[in-house]
Amino acid sequence: MGQKVHPVGIRLGVVKRHNANWYANPKQYAEYLLKDLQVREFLTKKLKNAMVSNILIERPSGAAKVTISTARPGIVIGKKGEDIEKLQRELTNIMGVPAQVSINEIDRPDLDARLVAEAIASQLEKRVMFRRAMKRAVQNTMRAGAKGIKVEVSGRLGGAEIARTEWYREGRVPLHTLRADIDYATMRAETTYGTIGVKVWIFRGEILGGMKQVMNPAPAEERPAKRGRGRGEGQERRGRRGDRAADKGE
C-alpha cells in the first residue's frame, strides 16, 4: 500500500524554509533542540486563541529571535505592548539567552493550512456536522484564491461505532511537484466520542524561483485603478447629456 511523504519535509530547501535556523556544536545540539521544543509547547498553550500558524526560532550569537506568524497580532502584542514584553521575559527564562519576539501578521488565514485545520477541529468539538465543516473550509479556501485544497477527517465520525475516513478535494493538489507551494497541517479534535484527526493540504501556486524567491519575495504590485463609471465620471456624463438636451431645446 502506497504511503504519502510529508509534503513540507520533502520540499525543505527547495521551496520551504526550516522552522529553526541555528548552528551549534555537537554537544550543544540536544540542549538547543530541547529548548526549541519547550518554547513551541509554551507558545502553543499560551497563545491558543491567537490563531498562531508558525513559530520560527533563530539563534544569532548570544541571543535568540522568535518570529510568531499569527492572524491576530493584537492578542499577542496586548495593550500598549505589555503582553509581548512579558512574553519576551518568559522566553528569555526558558532559552537562557536574551530573546527578541517579532510578529508576522497573516493577511489571508483561509490560505493557511494550520489555521484551516484548527477551524475544522474547533467546529467538530462544537458538534458541527463534519461534512458541513469540511465543505465550508473548502469553499472559503477556494474563494480566498487557492489553486486547490484537500481536507481529510478520520475517526468516529458522527458518533459512529466504527471509525472511518472521509475526504473532500477541490482543484489541484500536486504532491509530486516539488516547486508546488503545498501547505500541510494536522490537528486533533477531542470530541465526546473520541479523537478525530484532521488533515489539510492547500495548493497555493508554483514557486518558479526556488529558495531565492522564498527568502527574498518580490514586493506586492499595486493594483491598477479600475476603469468604470465612478461617481465623478457618471456625474460628468450626466452633465454632458444635460448640456446636449439644453442645446437641443435652444
UniProtKB/Swiss-Prot annotation:
One annotated GO molecular function: structural constituent of ribosome
InterPro entries according to UniProt: KH_dom, KH_dom-like_a/b, KH_dom_type_2, KH_sf_prok-type, Ribosomal_S3_C_sf, Ribosomal_uS3_bac-typ, Ribosomal_uS3_C, Ribosomal_uS3_CS
Keyword match Phosphoprotein: no
Biased composition annotated in UniProt, kind: Basic and acidic residues: 220-250
Gene3D superfamilies the UniProt entry points to: 3.30.300.20, Ribosomal protein S3, C-terminal domain
Annotated segments matching region Disordered: 215-250
Single Gene Ontology BP annotation: translation
Keywords recorded for this protein, A-Z: Ribonucleoprotein, Ribosomal protein, RNA-binding, rRNA-binding
Protein function: Binds the lower part of the 30S subunit head. Binds mRNA in the 70S ribosome, positioning it for translation.
Entry's family note: Belongs to the universal ribosomal protein uS3 family.
Xref: HAMAP family: Ribosomal_uS3_B
Subunit comment: Part of the 30S ribosomal subunit. Forms a tight complex with proteins S10 and S14.
Protein's name according to its UniProt entry: Small ribosomal subunit protein uS3
